[in-house]
Amino acid sequence: MVAVSGTQRTRTVSLARWAVYAGSVFAGAWLATQLFYLAQIALWSFVNPGSTAFMRTDAWRLSRDTPPAQIRHQWVPYDQISRNLKRALIASEDSTFATNNGYDVDAILQAWEKNKARGRIVAGGSTITQQLARNLFLSREKSYIRKGQELIITWMLETVLDKERIFEIYLNSVEWGRGVYGAEAAARYYYKIPASRLGAWQSARLAVMLPKPRWFDAHRGSAYQAQRAAVIARRMGAAELPQSE
């Protein structure tokens, strides 16, 4: 039998106390972060977000790399955005948006299998609400930790806000190119018209851009964009909008 000295016992107790303390600090910080997110979302029930995490990061990069450049963004009410664009985005990004709870389990499982096969994260299976959660609070980093936080924020959004409000914030904050955010800025940047006047074909082409907005901004008029837009345009008629629409 090996005797344990008093010094060793004291060291073990100290390490245990330190672990408990560190765990408590981490748990407290995590909880405070979640409460901050929840409070922000509750505020956005009646106040429009001024910016998003993506916008702030992009603004910093633009000021560093091309100082005269600025973020293009103009908030417009939900009813001042073309129904064509709303239908195009639902047809392209989240066909069950109006009725789902913010998650598409089948898409998440498919993304998991794809990521496992590739040995890295290449797909996320994100719904419109999940995309909004990421845009508002998180980064472009691809990791399972970030994905877990995204799922928590998605639950908060779906619990606190109704579908129309979620879609309104999404439409006004999603990225559509280098420094271009929201439907109004995108409509004026690409077509020189307000978002309320976007036609079906214009809306379908904008919807194609969302997975890789900066790439499509730099490669406008690509054959793929036209082909994919045609597919989205055919699906738009079946796209179900939030109830009030």
From Swiss-Prot:
This is Biosynthetic peptidoglycan transglycosylase. It is a single-pass membrane protein. The chain crosses the membrane at residues 20-42. SUPFAM superfamilies: Lysozyme-like (SSF53955). It holds the Pfam family Transgly. Keywords: Cell inner membrane, Cell membrane, Cell shape, Cell wall biogenesis/degradation, Glycosyltransferase, Membrane, Peptidoglycan synthesis, Transferase, Transmembrane, Transmembrane helix. One of its GO terms (biological process) is peptidoglycan biosynthetic process. It catalyses: [GlcNAc-(1->4)-Mur2Ac(oyl-L-Ala-gamma-D-Glu-L-Lys-D-Ala-D-Ala)](n)-di-trans,octa-cis-undecaprenyl diphosphate + beta-D-GlcNAc-(1->4)-Mur2Ac(oyl-L-Ala-gamma-D-Glu-L-Lys-D-Ala-D-Ala)-di-trans,octa-cis-undecaprenyl diphosphate = [GlcNAc-(1->4)-Mur2Ac(oyl-L-Ala-gamma-D-Glu-L-Lys-D-Ala-D-Ala)](n+1)-di-trans,octa-cis-undecaprenyl diphosphate + di-trans,octa-cis-undecaprenyl diphosphate + H(+). HAMAP family: PGT_MtgA. Peptidoglycan polymerase that catalyzes glycan chain elongation from lipid-linked precursors. The keyword Repeat does not apply. Pathway: Cell wall biogenesis; peptidoglycan biosynthesis. GO terms for cellular component: peptidoglycan-based cell wall; plasma membrane. Its main location: membrane. Belongs to the glycosyltransferase 51 family. It is an enzyme of class 2 (transferase). The keyword Mitochondrion does not apply. Its EC number is 2.4.99.28. One of its GO terms (molecular function) is peptidoglycan glycosyltransferase activity. It is found in: Cell inner membrane.
